């Protein structure tokens, strides 16, 4: 029996449809409905948001399928779910359930420290994290249809997301301005497929969308990432760990859409209540930095 796979064009096109929007982490049908009402373009179904995963420690796995199913039945917008890096069966289970996207995520404890999933072998599109252009292109080479910065999830601290997005964009500009005869050496340096560098040179951009994620906690954070060139934002703990999730959700969506309307962002930021409590990145031990997972 011939396996039917989704084409890159279709998978990447689905991701393009989320461009300019906000994708929110949710752990229940109620939260999913709040996210949809606030204007989220998609939701990520989890058992625990990243800050709770970080606090609990231990091994973080794919969410209980009952939670994923509950979220899928609660909303009409696309539903994403996370699988562990390299965990073939978690990804196959989520695909069989009919989720719209799978996030091969460093937020969960990696199942394989050497190999990422061969995402081109799945019908469902994948989103993956990256810290630099080399990571981005390796994931695209494996079949990722959408990228996001890794940032440092569950911290409410946007500094790492800023660092990663700026680095990817700086490396993109370098590749775009290279002559063709320099691309093979750069591909070797980045540890990335030559064909993808050639594609970037031709297109003048990444072949897939790149969202910002990891530490976005306020409307201003979301607007900052859009200002820096993100195609949209993921918000993990920032909404449902804030004092007023409904207000924060709506404000972050509006700030993402109107990221250069600073008067509006000022008004959106008033009377929101307390944002989630933030963590200083330098206080995290290396083994506690989720961004270090994967390669």
From Swiss-Prot:
The active site is at 82 (schiff-base intermediate with d-ribose 5-phosphate). It is an enzyme of class 4 (lyase). This is Pyridoxal 5'-phosphate synthase subunit PdxS. PROSITE patterns: PDXS_SNZ_1, PDXS_SNZ_2. In the presence of PdxT, forms a dodecamer of heterodimers. Pathway: Cofactor biosynthesis; pyridoxal 5'-phosphate biosynthesis. Belongs to the PdxS/SNZ family. It catalyses: aldehydo-D-ribose 5-phosphate + D-glyceraldehyde 3-phosphate + L-glutamine = pyridoxal 5'-phosphate + L-glutamate + phosphate + 3 H2O + H(+). D-ribose 5-phosphate binds at residues 25, 154, 215, 236-237. Pfam families: SOR_SNZ. The gene is pdxS. D-glyceraldehyde 3-phosphate binds at residue 166. Catalyzes the formation of pyridoxal 5'-phosphate from ribose 5-phosphate (RBP), glyceraldehyde 3-phosphate (G3P) and ammonia. The ammonia is provided by the PdxT subunit. Can also use ribulose 5-phosphate and dihydroxyacetone phosphate as substrates, resulting from enzyme-catalyzed isomerization of RBP and G3P, respectively. It comes from Actinobacillus pleuropneumoniae serotype 3 (strain JL03). Its EC number is 4.3.3.6. The lineage of its organism: Bacteria, Pseudomonadati, Pseudomonadota, Gammaproteobacteria, Pasteurellales.
